[in-house]
Amino acid sequence: MPAVIGGLLVAGQLLQFLALERGDVSVAVPVFGIKVVLVAFFTTLILAESVGARLWIAAVLSVAAVTCLNRRDANQPSRHVGITLLSGGLGSICFALFDVLVQKWTPAWGIGRMVPLIFFFGALLSFALVPFFRAPLRKI
């Protein structure tokens, strides 16, 4: 369970970094904002808990606010919209699942065991990225 959550953390980071590196920030950030709606959706789906209308409205308003705050000049074309939407959206799904699965599985494990294990597995999985580094770690 902690390995799954740690994997979601690493996958979400990779996907959202990809969206920012290859795409347009003004497109990526509003896509990241859908995480709030996805958490509400996965809460009903995975935790089988009802989410009230007030929370759904708040989630949708949050996405709208993030979108409005990240408007760009209409004269500038967006870069790589497809990869931005895909990787940003998948990253948001990973982070939303991370949030919901922490709520679901932590009571059985206890916070003192679950959180350190999540970050241990996240760090362990991150070592798989070392071959893809373009510069030595001391340059970072």
Sequence positions of predicted segments:
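Helix-coil boundary and interhelical linker segments in multi-pass alpha-helical membrane proteins
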Residues: M1, F42-L55, K104-I111
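Alpha-helical transmembrane segments of compact multi-pass small-molecule transporters, enriched
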Residues: V31-L45, F121-L125
